[in-house]
């Protein structure tokens, strides 16, 4: 919720991963389009978050880190479940960084892990890594 994000920001987290609904709750107004997100993202950064991954479902995700914005394309996959997709995205990103990948490549891995989880096809994660495009915004 918005209040949860405010409380967490006081601790200066290295990474947070809201989705659009959670970002809307933090902002206090609906954010239906990615073009409406930057002001709220900036408020999260000013509030203490270092890196932010904004998940947007089939529209992909954005990584805000040190003034750089990366966009990972969404993949059209069959939806088996959305439960755990955010956790898969976070764990993919953290695992990638721990493996020594660049932020861009760790973000690609994160998006692939989330897509594989949604599809219920975790064994296809490496294939999804090759299919996901990441570009700087």
Task: Identify the residue ranges that each predicted region occupies.
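Conserved beta-alpha-beta core of the PfkB/ribokinase-like small-molecule kinase fold
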Residues: 1-35
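Conserved phosphate-binding/catalytic region of the ribokinase-like
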Residues: 6-7, 34-137
């Amino acid at each position: 919720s918005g209040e949860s994000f405010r409380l967490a920001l006081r601790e200066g987290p290295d990474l947070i991963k809201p989705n659009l609904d959670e970002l809307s709750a933090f902002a206090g107004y609906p954010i239906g389009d990615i073009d409406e997100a930057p002001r709220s993202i900036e408020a999260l950064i000013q509030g203490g978050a270092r890196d932010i991954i904004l998940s947007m479902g089939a529209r992909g995700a954005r990584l805000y880190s040190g003034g750089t914005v990366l966009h990972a394309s969404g993949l059209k996959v069959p939806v088996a479940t959305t439960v755990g997709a955010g956790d898969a995205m976070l764990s993919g990103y953290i695992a990638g960084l721990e493996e020594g990948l660049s932020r861009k490549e760790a973000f690609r891995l994160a998006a692939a892990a989330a897509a594989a989880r949604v599809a219920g096809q975790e064994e296809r994660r490496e294939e999804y890594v090759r299919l996901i495009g990441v570009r700087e915004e």
